[in-house]
Swiss-Prot record:
This is Conserved oligomeric Golgi complex subunit 6. The gene is COG6. GO terms for biological process: cytoplasm to vacuole targeting by the Cvt pathway; intra-Golgi vesicle-mediated transport. GO terms for cellular component: Golgi membrane; Golgi transport complex. It comes from Eremothecium gossypii (strain ATCC 10895 / CBS 109.51 / FGSC 9923 / NRRL Y-1056). Acts as a component of the peripheral membrane COG complex that is involved in intra-Golgi protein trafficking. COG is located at the cis-Golgi, and regulates tethering of retrograde intra-Golgi vesicles and possibly a number of other membrane trafficking events. It is found in: Golgi apparatus membrane. PANTHER family: COMPONENT OF OLIGOMERIC GOLGI COMPLEX 6, CONSERVED OLIGOMERIC GOLGI COMPLEX SUBUNIT 6. Keywords: Golgi apparatus, Membrane, Protein transport, Transport. Signal peptide: none annotated. Belongs to the COG6 family. It is a peripheral membrane protein.
Amino acid sequence: MDFLDYQAYGVPLTGTDDELLPEPASNLSLLAASGPSVSELNTSIQGDSTPPLLNTDSNFNFEGKDNLHERMEMYSELTVKLLPIQPGLVRDIFEDVTPQSSDFQHLLKKGNNVTSAVLVKRLSHVLNDMNHPNYQSDLQLKKALMILQDNQGVLGLDGSKLVRPDFLGSLSRKTLRSQLEKELLKDHLATLENFQPIARRIMRLRQPVKNIQEISEKVLDAQEAQNKSPLQDPLVSEVREKLEMLKLKKRVLVGIRESLTLNQLEDEQLRNGEIEDSYLDVLDKMMEIKERSTYLIAMNYEKAGKALLGNINQYLQLANKRIYNYLLGFLYDYESNTKTFGERNFEGDNVGLSLFQRCLVYLSNDLEYFNDFMKKVTSMRSKKLLDEFLIPFVIDNNEGRSIILSAHDPARYLGDVLAHVHSLLANEGDFLKSLFKYQEERMADMTQSIFQKNKDILQSLHVNMLNDIMSTLSNSVRIRLEQIVRFEEEATVTFDISQLLSLYKLMFTKQGMLDDNKLVKVFDDLAVLAKTKTMNYYTEFLSEAVKEEPEVTDLLPPKWLSKYLSDLTALFDKINGSSEQTGIVDKNFFTKLVKTPCESTFLKQAELCFPLAKKDRRVKFDLLVLEINGLDMIVSRLGPYRTNIFSDEYGSEVYDSLKRSLDTLLGQLEVHQTRNILESTGLELYYNLFNMIFPVASVQDPLDYDMYLSAQENQIMKLETIETNIAQKLSDYLPKALLDVQDTWLLYLASPKFADDIASRSFHVFANFYVVFKSVLLNIFPDDHQRINSIFIYSEEEVKMLLGIN
């Protein structure tokens, strides 16, 4: 047992010096101790004779010791025991080292204990250090030591001797090693003895087997020579070829049978197996068999093909029924979990979802089951969606905020309802998309023939399902929204409602709702109704205004026109605030709400207020002032919307038409004002006469005066007549003409700018005619200049000064 020798572990360990365990110290040098000299010791030792071991009276018996090692061990123990001890000498030598030791035996025992403890600690460290370079061999050594320890009683081991570091310990370990080797050899011999009968049989059968081998080689050589012989029988070859052909046909038929039929395991799985991926793999095989059966029919194997096709159809009918039940169970389980744990969507990596979608692909091949399943899903989800829709309308519900109709803000109520429906749509769309929308990465795992055949239906399945489910809410939504639209009279509110409906229609279509969906049609119908209500508000307002008795105060527009324009501009503000005009601003809008009330309703009502306008110039003048005031208010109120509401072609035309009507009325009022001034000064007849000859406004220089020479033939051109008709009126009126025009004629014109412009232009016309008429008279009557100057007492500058013009 050299492997148990402690000196074998004296190799340096990897690591720092601090980690090294202390090694046993060397024997003490007795020569270094104080005591007698070496020569004296030698003399004393030589003087003493070694005691004979065999003649001692001891209990050591060497006769029964056959083992050399045992005899040597006993001899060494006896030698140590009989060694003479000199107490004084030992005490003198070791008193500096071990002052408490009384003899050599005590010193040796204590040294052995200390050394054993140190070595045990070092051995434990070595055997348990995983970083030791010989860790694997250490593990085997540790295992061997543990086996020895477990069998210590059986082997009769003396542990104190085995671990001694001296010669006796080494001798004990070698003895133990030899004993273990003997035991190991005994075990090996016992094992080999068990194989001895087998070896005997092999040796006994070796010669017969060799003979058989030689005979078989001779037979094979003879057969090979016979095959190479030209005398081979053709009948045997023909039979052999037929046999090979039959074997080949058998293999082909077996392959066809396996490709066209289901084995017992597949049949059992199809009928009673659990719906999983392996079940669908069997269905894939059935679909391939069905496709091959059509090939058989096309290859003149009609009977076999039809029989196979009928059998496969029965299998497929059974499989479709089981898949149909599985899909329904999947949805019912989901509904049950929803009631317990709440609504949830399926994740993309859900294994059950992948199986569900694969099953749905297979079921799409059977329209009867597929349509029935879709109807059940639609019915199930519709009921759930309707219940969720009605919850907020219950005042005492505990599941969320209630939606309450307020008379002060119906648009908000309608918006809350639409927002609630949109949230239901979004949630339902996400759920159906997670359940029925096929992802690209999943399509590769599905049966491509079925998927490609029904690709259009399957890829749009979630959209169609969403439209079918949401359509069931159309009546409930219509009931709650239509009453708001029908009973609302305010134009701006109905416009807001139409805007909301149009906006949510757009949002619904972006979520996948189709234009022909019942719910979307409800939004369209209600939006049209809201727009109609908006238009009807203004048309009914105008109808009521026409029925009322016209009231004119200070030639100002009627009150209804001001109220109408306020309501109309409020609508325009709403339209400007929206992102688009939502189709309400069109030709009919401008015709009914702008053109007709302004050009027809107001002007006709104004004419009714002044029935004598065609006969009385004064009444006509007041009518013009009233119409100008009304159109001026209309144009000024609609002016800010010129670049937006009236930006299109027809709107711009309507606005320009109002401007032209206003300009026309201003021109007519200017003409009437000019005639009033001419009439007040007595020059009206002469003004008309001169204009019939040549327009007075076209006179540029004195040469043009000659064109009026023909006017002297008229009786009214005599100086006496002129003096009678003009002199007194002219001298009396001109000083007060400015005040008369501003404070009498144009007093009720609402726009100061229009009043100043009309007065200024009419005064310019009068002053121009005054100068032309006086100059023509001076030219016609050159000898009566003094008389003419007495009639026209004011010069041109004086007239302009009196009239307040430049």
